[in-house]
Amino acid sequence: MGIFGGRKQQRHALVLKDHVIRYVSSKRADLKTIQTYGEVYLPPGLIHRGKLVDKEAVKRLLELQQPEWELKKNSPVQICVPDSQLLIRRHEVAATVPDEELKGQLYIDTGDSLVLPFEDPLFDYQKLREDEEKKELLLYISKESVMNEYVTLLDQLDLQANAADLTSACAYRLFHEQNLLDGHPFTVSVQFDVSLVNITILASGRPLFSRTWPLAYDEERWVIHEGQLEWRLDSESLREEIRTVVTEIEKVISFYQYSVLKGEVEISNMLISGDMIAMDLIVQECTDYFSQMKITSQLDFTDSYVPARYYDALGLMLRKEVR
């Protein structure tokens, strides 16, 4: 996805989530030239469902981290679209609409043939196919007001956003870089993070369908201790949470496989990444539940000394196209 559109070797990948901000810098878009990485966990409420609730507090935290991360003024920065603020839709327009006018046509269609749950869409798209009558597009839609808040935050820090990507595309890119993918056309990516689970169906790395499952991020369940997150409840509560999510993953896979693919193609590959604690338990639960699927996880990563919980920042850093 390219909400912004290519250039420059240096990479400064910055991922903001409800519970954490992570950063990876590299001389260029590969794992062998990583220079710096770091993270800072956020108290509950500063960012909620991807929206910047306390902008000043987030700004202050980033200002404190900039010297340690060696994130200098005027650096070009890559960011991710918040998962909970993203829609993926298929949409058709008339074949007579010129390619250079497609984005404008999407705004014309909004509220008519393209019904959205918010009024300020920001569109990116890929053309899937076209014939004499129509062009079929795959739309990636975020809220312009939300993305503008992130761009404004970077401006206040004297940083410049030069690319925005989907976390699911970033995760897939990292698995590809690690040579952990096979040739199966359809894959389900499960990103099991502390505050959100993102379940995405991809075809050859292209996100086609996505559902998010919010997880409670509050002081009853989590505490920041010596710069790290710690789970406050018992292990059985954690296991129950994992099992609940696994059943939701199964619902998403079944819906797409039988309602969209009409049962004609099997989704047999699953990629698991995330920053939730007990990733080994998550992988085991998925392996047991989806016994007919090939499960590949971040536990298989080998080519980076950066912790695997940085998976989306690493995948964002690997993005080739920046402005």
Predicted regions and their residues:
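Hydrophobic/aromatic-enriched cytosolic interaction surfaces used to assemble or bind macromolecules
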Residues: 1-323
